[in-house]
Amino acid sequence: MSDNGDNNTKSPQHNNPQPNEKSDGKVQPGQPQVNPQRKFTAGINKKKEKLNEDLSELDKLRQQLIHFQNQFRLAVADKENVKRIMQKNIDDTSIYAISNFARDLLSSCDNLETSLKNLKEGDSIHAGVLMTYKELLNTLERHNITRIDPIGEKFNPQFHKAVSQMVDAEKDDNTILHVVQPGYIIKDKLLRAASVIISKKSD
């Protein structure tokens, strides 16, 4: 009986660790060893590569932004240029149309001026002609047409037409002494040159 009891008694089982299992956190035989320094360096290198990729992409985006900004500026500049050209064409057309009409009025201005010189000041007719003359000049000025009366100025062939010369030792050469016929400009364009007599020092 005792033998059976002995036979039925089981010897204690021990859970021995397998060759590749960790029992105390240490690397067991047969498991590849990892170098912590190498692992850290690899991680840093990987982050550097990712950073370089991000910087490269950022640089591309920056270049694209500069390109689009330049394109936008060119588009705005082109638009402004077209606008200026169109406005200039409108102004030139307007000036051309007014110029033809204004030239017809200049002869009326000249006739009124001549009449004023020949009429006695204070006469009722003189007053009426003077009022008409002033109204005509005001009408011209409202359309940016200005009278040129350059006595004492230096002769400028762009706006003046010399019809004669007079000796005047006290004046510099080409000083305007008399205005035979006044000129007119419309904005910055010549409508009619002023006919003038200019000075010279001697014959």
From Swiss-Prot:
Q: Where is the composition biased (Polar residues)?
A: 1-20
Stored CDD domains: GrpE
The organism's place on the tree of life at top rank: Bacteria
Q: Where in the cell is it found?
A: Cytoplasm
GO CC aspect terms = cytoplasm
Pfam family of the protein (one): GrpE
Keywords attached to this Swiss-Prot or TrEMBL record, sorted alphabetically, are: Chaperone, Cytoplasm, Stress response
The question of whether Chaperone is a record keyword is answered with yes
Tell me one GO molecular function of this protein.
protein homodimerization activity
Subunit and interaction comment? Homodimer.
This protein is called Protein GrpE
